[in-house]
């Protein structure tokens, strides 16, 4: 039943994304800001919140240290003019560790929460288009990570387009395991770009 709900949610999100495809089609370049974990919840994991917080920082570093694998520009077929992790590192550093873990088997962000997360990113308000992954639910019991892909105006922080996606977590060690879900979502983003942009 839960898989059916997720499928319907993904289908609805992709339909909405398709409605805004002309806006994304006209975008030639983007600034990439990494993965924002400030709104995320973790379910079913044995590791501590502080271990997750450290893993979040190291996952984002992969966009620099393993840029060939985690190549956002290649997947989107757009020029990435800048990869800046400062903003997500700052908000991730301020995660409330007492609220990171959850006992609830389902969790998702509202449109208002996503908008607030974009507003909270401490970036310079210059003309351009930014992209960020906003982590929603890291579900160890199902080996899945759910993320919101968000394109936004970096000057006004107005959201241009967004959609939800999830990816299979895999790999050895806490960082690599959840980085696997990010990589899966990055590949899915490439498929979505081919279909909808």
Protein language model annotation of sequence segments:
Residues 37-40, 136-141, 168-169:
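Solvent-exposed loop/turn segments at secondary-structure junctions
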Residues 188-193:
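Conserved small/polar residues in nucleotide/adenosyl-binding loops
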């Amino acid at each position: 039943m839960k898989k059916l709900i997720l499928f319907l949610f993904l289908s609805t999100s992709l339909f909405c994304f398709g409605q805004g495809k002309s806006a994304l089609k006209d975008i030639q370049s983007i600034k990439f800001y990494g993965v924002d974990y400030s709104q995320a919840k973790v379910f079913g994991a044995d590791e501590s919140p502080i271990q997750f917080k450290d893993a979040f920082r190291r996952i984002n570093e992969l966009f620099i240290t393993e840029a060939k694998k985690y190549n956002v520009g290649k997947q989107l077929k757009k020029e990435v003019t800048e990869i800046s992790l400062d903003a997500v590192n700052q908000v991730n550093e301020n995660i409330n560790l007492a609220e990171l873990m959850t006992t609830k088997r389902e969790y998702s962000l509202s449109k208002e929460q996503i908008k607030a997360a974009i507003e909270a990113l401490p970036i310079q308000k210059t003309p351009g288009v930014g992209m960020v992954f906003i982590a929603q639910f890291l579900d160890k019991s199902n080996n899945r990570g759910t993320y919101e892909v968000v394109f936004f105006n970096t000057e006004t922080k107005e959201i241009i387009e967004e959609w939800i996606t999830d990816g299979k977590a895999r790999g050895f060690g806490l960082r690599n395991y959840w980085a696997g879900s990010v990589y899966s979502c990055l590949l899915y983003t490439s498929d979505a770009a081919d279909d909808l942009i």
